[in-house]
Amino acid sequence: MIYEFGDFALDTRRHELRRSGEPQHLEPQVYAVLCHLVEHRDRLVTARELIERIWGHRFITPGTLNSRIKALRRALDDDGTTQRVIQTVRGMGFRIGVDVKARADPPSALAIGGTSQQIRFCRAHDGVRIAYATSGNASGSPLVKPANWLTHLEHDWNSAVWRHWVSELGRAHRFIRYDERGCGLSDHNAGDLSFDAWVCDLEAVVDAERLERFSLLGISQGCAVAIAYTVRHPERVDKLVLYGGYAVGRNYRNQTPQQEIEGSLLRNLVRVGWGRDNPAFRQVFGTLFVPEGTPEQWQWFNDLARTLPMENALSIMEMTHGIDVRPLAVALDTPTLVLHSRGDAMVPFENGRMLATLIPGARFVPLESRNHVLLETEPAWAQFLEEVRGFLGGA
């Protein structure tokens, strides 16, 4: 999205503020403050809300936020006296004081490196057709993302939730991702939706692309698939990046009574409301995946959910609850980076920490976010990119 006000344009896809077309330097936290204020320009934003959005669970003094507001005003040719752009409501918070026009990215902006994604199909060991896509830097080292719950190659490419992942990770890498069996453009009547079948699907995709050596990016349940594949084929995996993942599903966790009720409630929500025209049931998942998202992003989750049959959604969810890769994780001998959001509502932080303790030599990076899928406007996304690029060696 591009937000225009006066001589300025805030481009959230490019993570950039421009003045009369020229990029302006902003520190990550200052940029995040601007994004949040602009995205919620129709109302007052409290200081507490900004602090929770930018710094998460860390303790900061009011002076820290005020210094970021001051830096933002300087960048916008504003000041605390005139408050032309950023207005302070004493004792309450801040709001945008100028008219802001929002427009979607031009279609060409969704192309990566001037090209679109290339979608192809391959067959898994049991004949199921798996849809996969390649995009990004064709001459870069391969980076493969094992599938996670709820994907659709075409839908994700244009989404307000995933497109910055695809574009940024494709800058330095030939980025390869696929729809898991039962989802998206892959066969929906797959029959076998077991964990072993998921690993075999990853094997089919990398073999179809004739990849000899590559890195894996596991997200959520994709972390377990990446681990299992690496143990089977250690000679083919260069490095492992695991974000928002876990070694054990809900069935093997020491859950509180409240967490057990939550798990049962989510399963029943899928059974009862997944196929209904009323989106209320499906929107629960959107707010769990991206609690700090916008209505547009929650609507995207609702639209995505409608592409997946209820029976498949439930079967895949129940299979994720039965995951246990602890014996495989301790057997890894591959450089591994583990990242996890402290406030993740879908996969609690402790699961990521435990995963990192199981993998020999793994480095663990906590991220200050409540989102299971990082959004492009939050500081945690910039930190994620910096850590991953430094680890993989990409620009």
In which residue ranges do the predicted regions lie?
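Flexible "cap/lid" loop of the alpha/beta hydrolase fold
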Residues: 227, 231, 238-271
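Catalytic active-site module of serine/aspartate enzymes centered on a nucleophile-bearing elbow/loop
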Residues: 362-395
